[in-house]
UniProtKB/Swiss-Prot annotation:
This is Small ribosomal subunit protein uS5. InterPro entries: Ribosomal_Su5_D2-typ_SF, Ribosomal_uS5, Ribosomal_uS5_bac-type, Ribosomal_uS5_C, Ribosomal_uS5_N, Ribosomal_uS5_N_CS, Ribsml_uS5_D2-typ_fold_subgr. NCBIfam families: rpsE_bact. The N-terminal domain interacts with the head of the 30S subunit; the C-terminal domain interacts with the body and contacts protein S4. The interaction surface between S4 and S5 is involved in control of translational fidelity. The lineage of its organism: Bacteria, Bacillati, Cyanobacteriota, Cyanophyceae, Gloeobacterales. Residues 13-22 have a biased composition (Gly residues). Residues 1-66 are annotated as: Disordered.
Amino acid sequence: MPPQQQRGRGRGRGPGGPGGPGGPGPEQAPEDPDRESGGERRRGRGRGAGRGGGDKAERAQAETEFQERVVQIRRVTKVVKGGKKLSFRAVIVVGDGNGRVGVGVGKANDVIGAVKKGVSDARKALIRVPLNKINSIPHPMSGSSGAANVFLKPASGGTGVIAGGAVRTVLELAGIKNVLAKSLGSKSPLNNARAAADALSRLRTLSEVAGERGVPVSNLWSR
């Protein structure tokens, strides 16, 4: 056998080679800091609430604060190449009764799916409504959506919600207790609900108006 091949064979476990007598021994894997002396892997012993546990609890609590009301469930038809496709459309209003309200629409092949989509859409369209001490709006305001127009006017304590249909649902879930409302134009529940939400989104407090004009709030009260 040539001397070069003999040297190549002797490198395996010969004297002084890796794994041989007097050699450095076989390569070992790096130690795992999470593995104990018995070979078992240590489990985490942190004191945290878990991965995302706190966020889930806060999200669940926020969901329970909102109330959901179905304004309308309607069967709709879409003409496609193969014929007519039937589905359901749900108009949903979501609010916490403390100044937050939203209007959403959902469409699906069944009623339950349409309601779920409507609730999700309404939560994405939440608006903040400024309320005064008697749970009324700070000033008159009007809103529109399509051919529907809604006019809102503040009322004194004990008046109640003078409104009907979808407009009343939006006002109640927003937490308004005393208000006068008038609907003009279209009688569509969806357009009336959106018109009411549009009017509420335009409301402003005295402090906001004073900040925009650069004057103290007392000047607005004197007028």
